[in-house]
């Protein structure tokens, strides 16, 4: 079981995600992004098997309160999973660039090809995913591996060593097939090296 520290970026999807993780048997503690990174870091350090979940939210990563600072403090120390805005914040934290996607995507189902990474274990490729975003990673640093794309747009990344992964799409949406399996796989992968 993971102790999920959930960074809430004031998004309407938050409770769908929290419910999914709890139904998978994980403990979830929610911190809104106006809480100082230092406070959240102290809470993380007291937990066994912590995984930081960086939630979706409005705007750009730089506007997401304490989240960017928290990623800088915790990367390489604690596994992290970012969704939508959280994914974009991970890309920026590792030196990448996030910019306009060319169109605003709101509730669109896309067929995504993935690289059969452990996170996508036993999931079909292409996989139907739900997208809600206007920003996208336009430059991904060498330290991150792109694990899935749609129309040459980056849909997921991982940092194998740091146990950090990001999803541009919404696994918790009903429109993403196998979303619960994907989130379960991501947590399992995140905790693997943690115990090694």
UniProtKB/Swiss-Prot annotation:
Write out the catalytic residues in the record: 84 (nucleophile), 170 (for gatase activity), 172 (for gatase activity)
Fill in the subunit field for this protein: Heterotetramer consisting of two non-identical subunits: a beta subunit (TrpG) and a large alpha subunit (TrpE).
Can you give the residue ranges of the Glutamine amidotransferase type-1 domain? 3-196
- Give any single GO term for biological process: phenazine biosynthetic process
Gene3D superfamilies membership: 3.40.50.880
Look up the domain of life of the source.
Answer: Bacteria
This chain belongs to the protein called: Anthranilate synthase component 2
């Amino acid at each position: 079981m993971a102790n999920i520290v959930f960074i809430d970026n004031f998004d309407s999807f938050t409770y769908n995600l929290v419910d999914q993780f709890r139904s998978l048997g994980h403990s979830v503690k929610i911190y809104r992004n106006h809480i100082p990174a230092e406070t959240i870091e102290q809470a993380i350090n007291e937990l066994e098997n912590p995984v930081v979940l960086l939630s979706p939210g409005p705007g750009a990563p730089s506007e997401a309160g304490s989240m960017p600072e928290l990623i800088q403090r915790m990367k390489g120390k604690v596994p992290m999973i970012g969704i939508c805005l959280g994914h974009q914040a991970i890309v920026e934290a590792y030196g990448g660039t996030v910019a306009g996607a060319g169109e605003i995507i709101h509730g669109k189902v896309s067929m995504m090809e993935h690289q059969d990474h452990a996170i996508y274990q036993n999931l079909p490729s292409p996989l139907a995913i739900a997208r809600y975003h206007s920003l996208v990673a336009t430059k991904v640093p060498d330290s991150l591996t792109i694990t899935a794309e749609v129309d040459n747009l980056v849909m997921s990344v991982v940092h194998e060593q740091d146990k950090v992964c990001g999803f541009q799409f919404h696994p918790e949406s009903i429109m993403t097939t196998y979303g619960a399996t994907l989130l379960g796989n991501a947590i399992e992968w995140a905790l693997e090296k943690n115990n090694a």
